[in-house]
Amino acid sequence: MVQTIPIKPADVSWTDDQWKAIYASGQDTLVSAAAGSGKTAVLINRMIEKVIATDNPINVDELLVVTFTNASAAEMRHRMSEALEKAIVENPTSSHLRRQLSLINKAQISTLHSFCLAIVKQYAYLLDIDPGFRIANEAEVALLRDDIVADVLEGAYDSEEETQVQAIYRLVDSFTSDRDDQAIETLISKLYDTSRVHAEPQRWLWSLPKAYELAEEVTIDDLELSHYVKLTVRHSLEEAFVLISEMRAITLQPDGPAPYAETAEIDFAMIQEGIRISQEGTWQELFDYFATVKWSTLKRVSKDALVDVELQELAKKKREAAKKIMNKMKETYFIRTPARLLEEIRLMAPIIGTLVELTTIFSEQFRLAKLERGIIDFSDLEHYALQILTVEVDGELQPSPVALDLKKRFKEVLVDEYQDTNMLQETILQLVKSGEEQDGNLFMVGDVKQSIYRFRLAEPKLFMRKYSEFLETPDATGMRIDLNANFRSRKEVLNVTNYIFAQIMGERVGEILYDDNASLKPAAPYDEKEVPVELVVMHPPQDEETVDEQEDKTDEASELEELKKSQYEARFIIDRIRQMMEDGTTVYDTKSMTERPLKYSDIVILMRSMTWSTDLVEEFKLAGIPLYAESSKGYFDALEVMIILNVLKVVDNPYQDIPLASVLRAPFVGLTENELAKIRLADSKVPFYDALRQFIRSEGQGVQTTTFEKLQRFMLAFENWRDLARRGSLSDLIWKIYLDTHYYEMVGAMPNGKQRQANLRILHDRALMYEQTAFRGLFRFLRFIDRMRTRGDDLGTAKSIGEKDDVVRLVTIHSSKGLEYPVVFVAGMGRPFNKMDFHHPYLFDQDFGLAVKAIDPENRITYTSLPFLALKEKKELEMRAEEMRVLYVAMTRAKERLILVGSVKNWEKTRDNWQDAQNIPSDAPLQEYLRARANSYLDWIGPAVARHGDFASQATTSYKELDSPSHWWIQPIDTRHYSYDIQAFNDEIQQHLTTQEDEALLSEIKARFHAQYTYQKSTRKRSKTSVSEIKRLENLQRQEEPEYYFATPAKRTSTSIAPRPTFLQDQQLTGTEIGTAVHTVMQHIPQFGFDTIEAVKGFVANLVAKQLLTEAEGKVVPIKKVYHFFHTEIGQRFKQARQIRREMPFTISRVDEDGDAQIVQGIIDCLFEDEYGNWVLLDYKTDRILPHFAKEPALTKEIMGRYAVQLRVYSEAIESILQIKVSEKVLYLFDNEQTVQA
């Protein structure tokens, strides 16, 4: 039942839609919350209001709150606790509120996996699993999966049924090479994963072959997938139609090729008819249409005709492009007859059946293997929970008694990030919610425009169905609420985002209509200054190479060009960052609500992937700008990791020549190339390891060389490692290798040493994690690492810069989701989308299952079957829709400045292609074919921006501008501005050096290379030092002190007056430690001292009790000497002082005798103002003074000579910092209870 929403008070800050989302109830509710609209705050406040409501409040454990991450769940739980505590303060007598606070830790606020885990733990007795199960880690699951799928294939090969074996071989021949059957293992594993997002995986699997078992009367139009091919054909026909339309327009120009006009009209009508058939006709009609397409010959243009030759050529070029598109469509889809296409589908049914059978066997054996080990994985959690929540009735799944109990328990089910759920998760949610959509208790929050996890099998169509069906007002279905007020970004960022996505995002291409309900509305409190969004297009010089030359490049050349793009874009970003920092750019601080200077940590660089991360990090390092890159790549390519992995490979099997050679060349063995060659020559016909042993035997019999000694040490350690590998743990072996080789210390001394050591620690930690699984052994671990590398599951190198430091951040767009940054660079906008999944001979889909290429096993020919073609078109449309959403996430991360950076090969050609969009009616979005063929973000943004008024400075044609409040700064930048060619620079220097005529330049260069640095002495000084260090250095220069002032008259000691004072001798603590203890006592002792020695002793004991002194220190404090201090003249003045400051730390800048500035730190023992207003500097000394010299007049001179520098610096610090005059500088010598005046 729909309930009335309370009236919003005038003094609340919620928008009307937010208020509605917080209080709406009585039916399922979908909140479509755009970026920056405060959806998390709305969700949390809805929970809070449900619990603290005065009318019909619910208990906090009657809410089921499902979040996407554990961090989100923890934040919600914390904010709920804070809200309850605040409510209790306002209503301290409420027993309900106090009870909620005690229930908060029992509340089901978690990820869906955690909720499923709770169900499985509680009801494990309903399943055939060990109640003491544990969640397996990814490494263990991966290893087990690899073993099981290999066993399944091995078992299939060994089958006694000939028909089954033949079916297996046909399957293998269809999808693998002659080398191995790894592709079949991958195919089985991926098909298994796809099946697991369905509530009934086995039923879904067995439906796949049926889709290929077509009845005779079936036509292609009966196949749902054929719609996607027709849509693609239509897009191509529309593109050809635009080209012919442009050709026709050219023929009608005054100086255009008029003789072409008749042909253009024929072509125009022909393609128009094709578009009609693609929309309304059958497949057979389309086939017949392409079979009859004929291109007539263009009429000859008379030489005497007044025709612009360039227009004539342009008309030809447009027509040829249209013909190319049409011919490609025919060759791709309409060469084979419809009957042939259907027959190819039927022929694939047995192969699909065999694959499904193997996947089913694998699924069961994998399940049993996990049961045997008492483990489950995350996918099992959801399926076991579903098993507990359902019972099968007449072949359909119905809620079980457990599900019915949960329906009663949970008064509301709230789901965050609903756009990222899949079909299985939706099924679980439906089983625990109450009612139907029109009277249910399911509250869903999300933004389908930010659904970017399809690769994890998320299904955004779930959100889109409800979005289109739920009404904005209560009716016979659920309620939809749109939150589009953006509290994050400046209006310039939002206007540009709206401008772009209104043109590119539609229902057929983009899966979402970006209308007024979806557009972002500015709501953040920024000032009115104009901050345009920047579009930067990097391009090579136009005269550097032709387009044809660019297209003819080899793969290696393209790779080098890609490297250049990353460098150029990095250098522009560095330059732009420097410019902003130097120009005093400010950003708005939401905490202080004021403008403040831009910091590095305000800046982020977003990229689709981290492929360029290494290049960007290197460029930023050279530029001196700190960059933090959270990369998941490059770990296994790190030199130190490769070397240790090679050591492990050789320990496992020494008969691996390349790893063994790598280990011998490593610094901890240290063989040269010549030494390796000598070993190889010992016996070139045997494996290298045998040659190595033979070399050692032969060398050992003669004069033992350095090479022999290196190898002997290595082989001794090597045999120990092999022994440990057989009987010990893997992690111990790795650490033993580190210790024996000292390699861990070696890499620490290399550049980026901390990072390299962290990489080695990660390898050790990975071994520890591996050992926690049911697997053991070095061989399996190495195989596991190899599989990780094959699958691309890199670990990412350790980082020496922390992400909380004041650094620029480089992150993927996916990692940035949910975050915000004042300044956002989106780099790599011109990089092509990743289409690697379309290169396989198979494709997966949650709706249509599996599509494979047609195989002719007899002729060994592969065809692109119609299901494969259709599913490829569907997946490409989905891929582009996902990329649009990724772009949306990237652009909406920016709070104040958004800078889009991309590279193109040829700016003039790119600009002309973008300008084609200027012919579109001004009230229409970009044509579907333009959006559907895009291969990069620039392919969407460029044509859209070309219709904007700010593009006029770049345009070569006139056009009608789109009406838009957005503001762009468009910058095509020649890469020559950022071409720092180090080799060319070196070549130029070399040329100058070898030019005999320029002797003056040569002399100047030589003089500079041999120049002596003027301030060489200053380089040996510390820029920051202590008073003690200054004192020590000055005393080292003093050579005049007489020998008899030292504690050992017969032997001169270093720089101290004596090794120890009398009261410090025969103690376990050092003199420094006991001197510190005395200073501690003097720091805390009362100003008026004590009347008795026992009182001083009690005071010291109290310091020990308070742990300000250790027991050992308390025992050696000279109690009597401390007592006597207060009975000396200086002690009496201390007792009568007006102010006292003790243990006063300071830091000052001072200039030394060479004129160099130094930062000096120190701690002043005591500073007091006596009863006459004089400031006295008092310093305590515990140096030992020999008795027969204690009263010598020379002692004063000696003591002050030693400590004058210290007292002078202390005095300078006091006068500089406190702005007071030091009247006296006094040393108090505890050893002989004497005062020495400076």
Curated annotation (Swiss-Prot):
Entry keyword set: ATP-binding, DNA damage, DNA repair, DNA-binding, Exonuclease, Helicase, Hydrolase, Isomerase, Nuclease, Nucleotide-binding
Named cofactor requirement(s): Mg(2+)
Signal sequence residues: none
UniProt GO BP: double-strand break repair via homologous recombination
InterPro entries registered for this protein in UniProt: AddA (IPR014152), DNA_helicase_UvrD-like_C (IPR014017), DNA_helicase_UvrD/REP (IPR000212), P-loop_NTPase (IPR027417), PDDEXK-like_dom_sf (IPR011604), PDDEXK_AddAB-type (IPR038726), Restrct_endonuc-II-like (IPR011335), UvrD-like_ATP-bd (IPR014016)
Record's keyword annotation contains NADP: no
Catalyzed reactions: Couples ATP hydrolysis with the unwinding of duplex DNA by translocating in the 3'-5' direction; ATP + H2O = ADP + phosphate + H(+)
One Gene Ontology cellular component annotation held by this UniProt entry: DNA helicase complex
Residues that, per the record, bind ATP: 33-40
Subunit text: Heterodimer of AddA and AddB/RexB.
PANTHER family the record matches: ATP-DEPENDENT HELICASE_NUCLEASE SUBUNIT A, UVRD / RECB / PCRA DNA HELICASE FAMILY MEMBER
Function of the molecule: The heterodimer acts as both an ATP-dependent DNA helicase and an ATP-dependent, dual-direction single-stranded exonuclease. Recognizes the chi site generating a DNA molecule suitable for the initiation of homologous recombination. The AddA nuclease domain is required for chi fragment generation; this subunit has the helicase and 3' -> 5' nuclease activities.
Name this polypeptide is given: ATP-dependent helicase/nuclease subunit A
